[in-house]
């Protein structure tokens, strides 16, 4: 058959079965085969698509079928593919469709013979598409035997076998082109095996179609006839490419059947994006099943849900990325309730398209999974202690320091994603597409053991802050966690003699270090000949010291405060009377050393790096100190009854640094500088050499040290304590037991304010040389014990920061990771800004130890020298870690003379020691305020101690608030990455994203340790900090990642401390006040020697602050300046001119300022010439005027020779500046003339210069002329100057017609001409700046005006609005057809019906904006030119004043027909308020000032024009004003027009409230302006249009009573004149108040009824009213007014009175009727 053959010729008969389907499998096969055919077709010709069907067979409709609509996204438009014809031979045995054939066709021989003739006759119908339901009615033609089919296949192609649809599936359809390839039996078997599980036997046989190889276009009609198909379920198969339905071209490429492969829907194996439809497609209605012609895995929650097992999704599978815009989940488009439970099905049932992908691609985030690392074990050969190198320092880690760290940015793993909520979390789908969704895992409980690395470790631990004890935990990384109580007090000894580079693997820490701990600080170098090494005891602490910055001085033990502390714990190891010292040789160091000096808590300064390295405390015995150990006594350990599991050691790297620094010291006379090491061992056995040296001294500690140091005066100052060491030890032991909690809390709170770099060493320890009695020990120095507080010792920082590890960089810089760790440990409100810069270098730690005195000093040392501990610490370590960089170094360092010990005599050194004895750190002493209540005598208390104390206590309360002790649980807390969490992307610190600030209780669900890969939450902390132990349990994710609740502790941490000193970007609390660094040459405000220049500066500063509000105050300041000469006066005038020219808006204010100055400043006489302010002002005006002309010529002149040629842009800019300055000057001149500061002659001269005698003046001059005329025209336009003014305006009129001028200039000329015609009443009068209260008031008026105008919209066009809303909203009823956009399926989700929680916000909350007809003012054609400019709204009233006579911005609503709209507040007349603030507003209405100002000045101008046009008005004016009255008579009154207007408005408002007519009469007398009465009446009547009927009735009664009053406050002429003014502006008033004509007629009717005005006069006013005479009648307004008058008379007086008044007036109603098409309904009642 031909391709272009007509459709009837290519079609075949279609039989339709109306029964319901018997199974889903057949339909799935049909869809599968049709899709496969379409795939082969669409691959070659994607644009081919059939035309819509024109043969809908409605007789076969079923109840469960829905009509197919074009573009249906659910199946109507999507499956429009080119299907092969049913008689194609390939369909019998192609791929998996062989099963469909056997299923549908039935057994051979069942049916009867075929009728070829009938088949030929039925060939006129179109070949239908594949049926989607099975039929229960069988045709007689379906019983075709295979033999008959073969015979038919070999016959003519036109005799196609008739098919009955409903029994055949798309598997039997033949493609457009036939092929001779034999069927592939392997494909059939394979497909049969694949689909055997989903296939059910068919009970209905079907006929075998006859082959027709020539029917190539039959597949184009497969889908046209079927208009509606039942919905079906399809198995998960590979979705082919679907051709868009909008393309109709048929592809000539042969369709090739492709085998359908069952593929899970969730996997990303879709070769092509799924097309749900093209343009103008409609979604299926949700009440019926849909027709799917495309193999899409859909699970419709309806009655025909198939029995197909759902896909199972495992939580641990990798993410499945897929295109989520085009995917549809089950039951989409159906507005059924969504079963959102605690555990949501993985497929997220009933969620629309585009909301969220079913299994979106997860970001490469971190789930807290720990990295498996193989620790390198290093075992010491002597102690066999294991040393691990794979741990990281954590300042807050009290658990295992060798916790496994995850890799940076690992790829997504297939292991189960451990979530972190203690209970299931209800996931609520947001209104937008979230790009991350993690579904709940299986409920398989985890074991109670430690978490393996395959799972995400959770860190549910509280932040260990100030008052909470730090527990000693010593456990391997992979053992079960257990609680380790705080250990017993241990003997803490320090030894820095080792240079072994090793790291301690297991750090332990106690929340309260041993009370009676012994800290021994020994010299870094020990002479080999002074003793042999001894084993160290079990509980010593090694503290490394550096010779750098060490200067030793002797100090008696009695000179120190009694309590001494180690790490915030009372140091109970007081020295005995004799403190023998054991000499310990140096191990692994070549430094020449001195014997160790024994002291209870003596320390020496070390560098920042060394101290921080020394903070590392380990349970294993230090490797580097095995050769030199001191055997301590065990009595201190027995006080607590407990011993620490292992000894506490220091970082060996510190000793190496110390050794290296000692090697670098210069030699002096063969001797090296000697490093002292302070030891706290009290009863350690000593060597003989030490005893020998001690024998030469006295045995009493106080006496000995006093004798050696020679500092007995200072000994008395500090109240020495001569008790024995044992007593002190016992006492301090008791103190420690009693106040363990207190000291632990207080000192650990204070530890954050102490810098780790100052832990061991004070600032200056000086090597004091005193006597020559011990000269037999030239190479050794003996130091007697002294009880020096060691609050800043090395272990102090270790009490809270156990695992802090720092670099040994000589530059003193911190690595960024160490800074971040410090940020985590510093507290909750650390400054983010400080996280980007390292702390400052410690000034004290960088000092280099210099040679002592001279070269002959060391060999001559005869006595033991005691190491003085200067209690001034190097630096405070505040709780906020970044504040270490902000603590001022000069504030904490010692006196300058303490450094002078590097050279000089021994007396100088002793003096320095004396000066440093009292140099205690203020912050250091405040830490022990609870115990050390008394300061030493002579202690210099600085004022900032109190501030530091307050900060310390606030920090303590902060820690108490944030601490969550949970005894009995393992606190294996990791270092927090809170600082890094605020930065959205930082690869360098990715491992900190998985660390948590604390644990999470149930209810917060916890997004602990999860980072959604290089993104996340920026600006807030991710992890709420709360308590909770680590418990292995099923963990849940938190819904959308990266968010934080409002009232979480994270926000509290940022908000806490907001009252502290601000630093950087964020507040940093708990920081001492930073000392200001004073510059050598500080900035000072420059002083002026010249007195005249000082005056000018003072005057300029005053003028800069000049505003209308502070005018009087600043004027007094100017008068206070001594202006006593012409130079000063000229300077004042020049500055006033400069300000006025640059700010033309304030010209009136500056002119007023000059007017006041002229009267206040005296005259001067210089050189016999009288100098006045006016004279200088006039000269300045002339100078500026001429200067403008010169500058304009220079700007327009081409550059001469020798001058730099200016570009056109530069010349234009200069021209603009000159023009702006000239305009300001002209305006100022005019304002000065208005103040009578200049003469009229000068004004005429200026006008003549601006007009020029030539015919073409510059546009700038014309603009200046128009500005000057608008300013002073009303004053110079009088009878004497009439001839001159006429000449000016004749020339201006001529210039306005010249086309050479710009349109802007021509309009300005026209406006000036109109202004003179209107008697100089400006439409937009500019009178200078407003006060701030006026600006606020006008802004409120404008807002109210706009709101009132918008509020009239619904009443005027509500019906159209409702129709629009019904059409555009999906909420319309069933009969309302929504627009195509509402039904079309899109990638944003299908339209949903009205149901619970599935409302589409895209249509409901959208504001409806529609065009609204705004009536335009009707203007008659007149001679006057049209003036363009802002006529109201926001164009006026914001920065200028606009006084007017009457307003026509009537704010009436269309709903006022029934008595007015009482809900709308009254609008204002203009932008001016009342001068009587006590006047109330009636009925809660707003003042008239709140009305719009659209046509205020137009009305005023119209009123003035009408005055000239009406002879009656002119005669009335002459009667009122007399023959000598002129136009300027109102200006001659005592009150200005603006004041009269304000008084009249305030009076009428007060009358509405109080209803006191006498008050109105008194106000009119106070006004004393009878000529203003018509204007006042016009204002009152116009204002009443915005008020209620009751107030209008009161106004009508008031007008009648005023006319009838005895004092004749008003007369009939004034009343008529006022009514005439209202009628002149009635056309504009109706625009804002549609019923203004009716309201005015009622007032007129009241006046006629009371016989104040006759009806004849009212009729005349109506006929002559309007902008043009007769315009009111022409537009129908006159008829409305007259009809309202007659209606009012009828209501008030009755029908008889109305007839009598009409007869007597002689008015003809026909004369007031408007011409067609206008009409007056009110007037028609009386015709």
Curated annotation (Swiss-Prot):
Comp. bias (Acidic residues): 1202-1211
Gene3D superfamilies assigned: 1.25.40.180
A GO BP entry: response to virus
Lineage, top ranks: Eukaryota, Viridiplantae, Streptophyta, Embryophyta, Tracheophyta
Protein name: Eukaryotic translation initiation factor 4G
Task of the protein: Component of the protein complex eIF4F, which is involved in the recognition of the mRNA cap, ATP-dependent unwinding of 5'-terminal secondary structure and recruitment of mRNA to the ribosome. Plays a role in the accumulation of some potyvirus during viral infection. Required for the accumulation of cucumber mosaic virus 3a protein and turnip crinkle virus p28 replication protein during viral infection. These proteins are necessary for cell-to-cell movement of the virus.
Region (EIF4E-binding): 916-928
Gene designation: EIF4G
Highest taxon of the lineage: Eukaryota
Entry-linked InterPro entries: ARM-type_fold (IPR016024), Initiation_fac_eIF4g_MI (IPR003891), MIF4G-like_typ-3 (IPR003890)
GO molecular function: mRNA binding; translation initiation factor activity
Keyword Phosphoprotein in record: yes
Compositional bias annotation for Low complexity: 25-38, 79-97, 699-712
Basic and acidic residues biased stretches: 222-236, 379-395, 714-736, 979-994, 1188-1200
SMART domains named among the record's database cross-references: MA3 (SM00544), MIF4G (SM00543)
Coiled coil: none
